């Protein structure tokens, strides 16, 4: 059985670490470079960096911050935000990331997934999915709709079907973020996570809502996720990563205790 992963997420705006609830009310909470280094030293399995306004502002990612983070950590590092072309992917990988996370850019131009996989390998391509629960319809039979531009634009695309498409185009991993749960610390959207993990064969990262080790354990077991993305739960000092790993391991999930 493969070890489950704990992945701290750094949402970055204007070069600073920030956090909101349901993509709103973001507040400055520190330096992303120092925070990434701390999580690496605590034993995080991976770090995810999102430039959360790059797509909405139609600009490139903050490569200088990516380079600074990459120079401080020695674990897998995934970067997303404003990635719309293979050249954007290359720039992020050259700045020190092991993986690129495409979200809005992939929805608008799905071929970027296959182009990126051909150029850099599927293992380097993560598709981020921002999802809202809506009324079920012929267009959205699952009741989960894809949204882009930081939750600002509904796309009329069913999340489960989009997940299958991403896998068929060559994505190596999916990061599934429930906007309804994001930042609430009330638990992951387990129905959504399970539906997607059952629909694809590639790893699924659960994102949005972690407030306790029990929430994370549920996502990694009942939700079928291979990894749990976390933010508020560690950013605000509620738990350390070693605390979380010990607690989740004690519940029966296989964790990598030391990197």
Curated annotation (Swiss-Prot):
Disulfide bonds: none annotated. The active site is at 11, 130. It is found in: Cytoplasm. GO terms for cellular component: cytoplasm. Belongs to the HisA/HisF family. IGPS catalyzes the conversion of PRFAR and glutamine to IGP, AICAR and glutamate. The HisF subunit catalyzes the cyclization activity that produces IGP and AICAR from PRFAR using the ammonia provided by the HisH subunit. Heterodimer of HisH and HisF. This is Imidazole glycerol phosphate synthase subunit HisF. It comes from Nitratidesulfovibrio vulgaris (strain ATCC 29579 / DSM 644 / CCUG 34227 / NCIMB 8303 / VKM B-1760 / Hildenborough) (Desulfovibrio vulgaris).
């Amino acid at each position: 059985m493969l070890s489950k992963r704990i992945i701290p997420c750094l949402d970055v705006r204007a070069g600073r670490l920030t956090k909101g609830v349901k993509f709103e009310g973001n507040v400055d909470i520190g330096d992303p470079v120092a925070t990434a280094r701390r999580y690496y030293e605590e034993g995080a399995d991976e770090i995810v960096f999102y430039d959360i306004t790059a797509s909405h502002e139609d600009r490139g990612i903050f490569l200088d911050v990516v380079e600074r983070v990459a120079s401080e950590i020695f674990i897998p590092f995934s970067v997303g935000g404003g990635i719309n072309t293979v050249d954007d992917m290359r720039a992020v990988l050259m700045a020190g990331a092991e993986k690129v996370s495409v979200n809005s850019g992939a929805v608008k131009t799905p071929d970027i997934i296959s182009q990126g996989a051909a150029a850099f390998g599927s293992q380097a391509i993560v598709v981020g999915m921002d999802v809202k629960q809506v009324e079920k319809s012929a267009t959205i039979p699952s009741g989960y709709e894809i949204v882009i531009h930081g939750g600002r634009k509904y796309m009329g695309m069913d999340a489960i079907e989009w997940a299958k498409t991403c896998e068929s185009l060559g994505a190596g991993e999916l990061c599934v973020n429930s906007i309804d749960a994001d930042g609430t610390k009330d638990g992951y959207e387990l129905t959504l996570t399970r539906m997607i993990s059952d629909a694809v064969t590639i790893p699924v990262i659960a994102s949005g809502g972690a407030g306790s080790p029990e929430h994370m354990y549920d996502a990694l077991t009942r939700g079928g996720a291979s990894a749990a993305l976390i933010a508020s739960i560690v950013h605000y000092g509620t738990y350390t990563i070693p605390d979380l790993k010990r607690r989740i391991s004690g519940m029966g999930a296989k964790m990598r205790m030391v990197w």
